[in-house]
C-alpha cells in the first residue's frame, strides 16, 4: 500500500499526494482524481471551452464567399470530397478529378483519413457538400454547420482527453498543489485563444495533431516511452509541422536510453514502435517508391519560398533589409534555413541528451518549436501554435512570460484574423484570457520558487522595454484598423507588427534556452539516474 505523507495545513487548497512505490501506478492517479476534484473542474471548464468554441464558429472563416479558391475552409471540404470519391492511391495524384492546383492534399495520410471519416459524415447528412467536382465552393448553411461540428468533435474527443491526461500526470509529479492551481492550468490549456481562433474561426484541425502531441508528452512524463513514440508518430502523420517538436522528443528519449544498461536495445525498441506506426498509416503508399515520393513532394512545397505572407520569424523580419529571395536560390535558402534551425535547436537538444529530465523535456519542446518557427523554411502565421502550445503546458512555471507570449502570439496573427473578419472574437478572447489569467489562485507564486535562476526583470530597463513594446502594439492595433497605409508600402503595418512580435519572440527564446540549461533536477522520478534493461 502507498504511504500517505502527513498533511500540511498551509492552506485549504493544499493537498499532499501519496507517493506510490512504483512510478506511474494507477493508485496515486486515482487518489489524486478523487481527492482533488479534478474531474469536476475539468468537466466544467471543458463545457465552457466548448461553449466559447461554438460562439466563435458563428463568425466567418477563411475565404468565406471569396471565389475562386475561397480559403482553408474550402481546402478542408475539398479534401473530404476527394477522399470520399476517389481511391486512396489517387488522393495525392494529379488527375481529371483531382486537380492538385485546386487545394491538392498537402498533409500526411492521417489527415487524409481524417478527411475521409469527416467526408462520410457530411455525405450522410448533406451529400451535395462532398459531391465530386460539383461541390467546389459549397457554402450551404447545413454544410457549414456540419463542417464546424467536425472540428468541435475533433477537439472534444482528441485534444480535451489529451489535455486531461497531461494534467493528471503533470500534477501527480508535483508533490503539492491546490485545486485552484490545477483548474487554472486546465483553463490555460483548453481556453488557448490562438488555437480556438485558428481552428474554430479561421478553420483548421490543429486540435488533432496538437492533441496527439500533448498525449505523447504526457506519456513521456509517466514513462510510457513506446506509447510516446506511437502517439508522436501519429502526430507527424497528421501534420508535418509536428516536426517542430521532434528534436525535443528525440534528444530526451535518446538521453534516457543512453543512461540504461542496454542503450542499444532501448533505442531499437523505440525505433520499432516508430517504424511500425508509420508503416501502418502510410501502408497504401509504401508499396511503390514513386507513390511514396509523390506524397512526400506534396508535404514540402519549397516552390512557395522561404516564407509566405507576413510572419514574425527571422526570415520575414530581416527581409526588410536583406532580400533573401533575390540574393539566394531556393536550394541555397533550404540549406541555410536548415542549418539555422539545427543551430537554434542544438542547445536544448544537448542539454536533454546529457541530462534528461521531465522539466527539461518540457522546456526542450518549447525551445525546439520556437527554433523551427523562427528559422525554418516556409513558416506560416499559424505555426506559432506549436511553441505556444509548449508554453501553455509550462504556464505554471512561466506565468508572467506566458501571459506576454500569449499577447504577442495573438498579435502576430492579427492581420490574418482581420482578413478573416474575426476581429470581435480576437478582442473577446483576448479579454477572456486576461480575466481568467488573473483569476484568484496561487499560480503567480510559482515563478518565485520554480524559476529563480534568471529573469529579465533583473536587467535595468526591462520593464520600460516591455511597456514600450506594449504601447507600440496598441498603437499598431489602432493604425491597422483606422488608417490606410501609403500606396508605396501597402503592407507597412503588417511589417511593423511582425518586427515587434519577432523582437519579443527572440528575447523569449534566449530566456527559455538559458532557463533549460540552469534547471535543477527535482522534477519527477525520471530525473534520477536509473539503470534499466
Swiss-Prot record:
Name of the protein described by the UniProt record: Probable dolichyl pyrophosphate Man9GlcNAc2 alpha-1,3-glucosyltransferase
One Gene Ontology cellular component annotation held by this UniProt entry: endoplasmic reticulum membrane
Main location class: endoplasmic reticulum
MF (Gene Ontology): dolichyl pyrophosphate Man9GlcNAc2 alpha-1,3-glucosyltransferase activity
Transmembrane segments: 42-64, 149-169, 184-204, 214-234, 264-284, 360-380, 422-442, 463-483, 491-511
Annotated stretches, region: Disordered: 1-20
UniProt-listed InterPro entries: Glyco_trans_ALG6/ALG8
Role summary: Adds the first glucose residue to the lipid-linked oligosaccharide precursor for N-linked glycosylation. Transfers glucose from dolichyl phosphate glucose (Dol-P-Glc) onto the lipid-linked oligosaccharide Man(9)GlcNAc(2)-PP-Dol.
Functional pathway: Protein modification; protein glycosylation
Alphabetically ordered keywords of this record: Endoplasmic reticulum, Glycosyltransferase, Membrane, Transferase, Transmembrane, Transmembrane helix
Keyword Transcription carried by entry: no
Bilayer topology: Multi-pass membrane protein
Organism: Arabidopsis thaliana (Mouse-ear cress)
Similarity comment: Belongs to the ALG6/ALG8 glucosyltransferase family.
Enzymatic reactions: an alpha-D-Man-(1->2)-alpha-D-Man-(1->2)-alpha-D-Man-(1->3)-[alpha-D-Man-(1->2)-alpha-D-Man-(1->3)-[alpha-D-Man-(1->2)-alpha-D-Man-(1->6)]-alpha-D-Man-(1->6)]-beta-D-Man-(1->4)-beta-D-GlcNAc-(1->4)-alpha-D-GlcNAc-diphospho-di-trans,poly-cis-dolichol + a di-trans,poly-cis-dolichyl beta-D-glucosyl phosphate = an alpha-D-Glc-(1->3)-alpha-D-Man-(1->2)-alpha-D-Man-(1->2)-alpha-D-Man-(1->3)-[alpha-D-Man-(1->2)-alpha-D-Man-(1->3)-[alpha-D-Man-(1->2)-alpha-D-Man-(1->6)]-alpha-D-Man-(1->6)]-beta-D-Man-(1->4)-beta-D-GlcNAc-(1->4)-alpha-D-GlcNAc-diphospho-di-trans,poly-cis-dolichol + a di-trans,poly-cis-dolichyl phosphate + H(+)
Subcellular location: Endoplasmic reticulum membrane
Keyword flag Nucleotide-binding: no
